[in-house]
Amino acid sequence: MHIDSLTPQAPPSGHPPVNGLVLMGGGARTAYQAGALQAIGALLRQKSHSRHFPFQVLTGTSAGALNATFLASKAMGGLNGLDDLANFWSAIRTEAIYHLPSTPLAKFSRWATALGLVLSARQQAAAMDSLALVNTLHKAIALDKIDAALRSGVLHALAVTASSYSSGIHWTFCQTRDGLPIPWSRPGRRAEQQPITIEHLMASSAIPFIFPSTPLWVDGGMEYFGDGSMRQISPLSSAVHLGADRILAIGVGQPQRANLAGQRNGNGRPSLGTIAGHAMASVFHDTLEADVAQIARINLSLNVLPDSVRAELPFRAVEVLSLQPSASLDALAQDHVHTLPRPIVRVLEGLGALQGSGAALASYLLFEPGFIEALMSLGQADVKARSEEILAFFEPHSVDPVR
């Protein structure tokens, strides 16, 4: 990450801090974010009498973009919006997100199921049909409420990222309070002012090989987009560009992959499910902590400069709090994978993705109550374990150009 993309112009001294929320992607795993945010809402209620929505800048990638946009639509309701997100996830089922392409004999035969997958892959370059998710999002997200939250000043900006298969560029689509053009462009990364739609969310959450790409109109032409986690080298950058002084970033990565490492195949060769899960991890989870560390280094560099030098620099320090699962989500998925619809279980079984390290693949697709509730409970427990740190993050102190 470059310093110019990370710490743009410093705000006026003493201005109230702008809180940003960055939500990373990860399919069903992002239910963890809903649990964590609900627990944060409970902490803030206990700490003060304020019920205001705690974030002014919302950015999200993949399923994290769905969460961010849902929250934007509920921001006028204050802290209740965090509870609404948790309730949304509690009601989710796999059939409301995707289904396997079907043939008349699919429910009787694994071969018929495989044939449906092959036909879908040829027609849509994707294994699953995600039309159900379109319907779910239209019912759950009132897009007009986002505009109302922006006009009222409750929100300053909402941003959703997606990766263009057509051009290879990683795009950030921004809907802001002032509606002005978004000024940043970097090699391989662009930003554009657009009202966020369900199509943007489908594009951002189109997991490669799993869900079909989505066409979006951008830069004067139509391009096909897939999951925003692909080629996302700087997940915190858009929140900083949009004015966040303090950023809470919630990922859904794997803390200790070694938890499942001992359950190897007898011949030592990884299954297709293991390889696919490893590939998914490289797409979704390898950039956030590196970005947080880079911000910490830049903050340190700015803070050791003499006051006279800092006063001349058009940069600012940005406070970041990162929250990641404290337990293995892969192992958690292994306990619940058999609750998926039977046709999907058959496919995962054929890929070797029902046990051991292969269960990582299932964790992205497991939109079933047991797994969702376990993820949300983990998010709530992790917030409670760090409650003092989180409450300190939300203290209403003023922000100086360099902290």
Locate the predicted segments by residue.
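C-terminal helical/tail subdomains of lipid-metabolizing enzymes
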Residues: 124, 301-403
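Active-site gating loop/helix substructures
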Residues: 153-245, 249-250, 255-274, 278-279, ...
